[in-house]
Amino acid sequence: MARRYCFTLNYATEIERETFLSLFSQDELNYFVVGDETATTGQKHLQGFVSFKNKIRLGGLKKKFGNRAHWEIARGSDSQNRDYCCKETLISEIGIPVMKGSNKRKTMEIYEEDPEEMQLKDPDTALRCKAKKLKEEYCSCYDFQKLRPWQIELHAALMAEPDDRSIIWVYGSDGGEGKTSFAKELIRYGWFYTAGGKTQDVLYMYAQDPERNIAFDVPRCSSEMMNYQAMEMLKNRVFASTKYRPVDLCIRKLVHLIVFANVAPDPTRISEDRLVIINC
């Protein structure tokens, strides 16, 4: 199983040649190049190199492209293979050949080419790449349903500019009102989503991108351990994240902060004038 292959296809007619080439989908390729050659015997053939986004077995290649082409796992660099394929006539080229030692390749591209290799060499980076990929897939497929009355009220509140004090508290004691569904929908718009937790854990995660709007989606089981401290620190836009990589953050940009909860806020632990309460 590999991503990079060389192939040769002997053909007799233009239709046969074009039919084979039409089987390559640009969405599946990192890089693709193919040239047209004529052997000393007069036999016309395609000489190509392809770098797929995902690994594929030889059996998979034959299933997709048929049995007539000859396939081999590629050796050498993309550029070396390109030179070999273009000795006579270049027919098609998709993408840019990757140079060994080039810094142009993004970390995500390297991860997608071989996740297992990155996991062995740099597990922390691999974990972050996987999380980013999963989030992108989640955001692209999540389908929100028709808004309920309280969700329309919340949406209207979010259309206003955020201030430096208000915390929007969405409260519904029964459950099943759509609080978590709305909170998850906000992820698609770049919001920071958290279920709460220890103050420094929350601050550390938020500090990775400290200009995001914030959604606390508090599980019912955590209602008695509501972290008002973290909520106020994030809303105040000045805090210290001391976990792993200590940093003091002073942020000018104001953000919305929403708490989705099964309980009403405790007035002994947070100033009532901060609160904008929306009942489900």
Curated annotation (Swiss-Prot):
Subcellular localization: Host nucleus
Short sequence motif named RCR-3, residue ranges: 84-87
Active site: Y84
EC number: 2.7.7.-, 3.1.21.-, 3.6.1.-
Gene Ontology terms, MF aspect: ATP binding; ATP hydrolysis activity; DNA binding; endonuclease activity; metal ion binding; nucleotidyltransferase activity; RNA binding; RNA helicase activity
Reactions catalysed: ATP + H2O = ADP + phosphate + H(+)
Motif position, RCR-2: 45-47
Cofactor note: Divalent metal cations, possibly Mg(2+) or Mn(2+).
Keywords assigned: ATP-binding, Covalent protein-DNA linkage, DNA replication, DNA-binding, Endonuclease, Helicase, Host nucleus, Hydrolase, Metal-binding, Multifunctional enzyme, Nuclease, Nucleotide-binding, Nucleotidyltransferase, Transferase
A GO biological-process term: DNA replication
Positions contributing to a divalent metal cation binding: E37, H45
Misc. comment: The genome of nanoviruses is composed of six to eight segments. In addition, some isolates contain subviral DNAs.
The protein's name in its UniProt record: Para-Rep C2
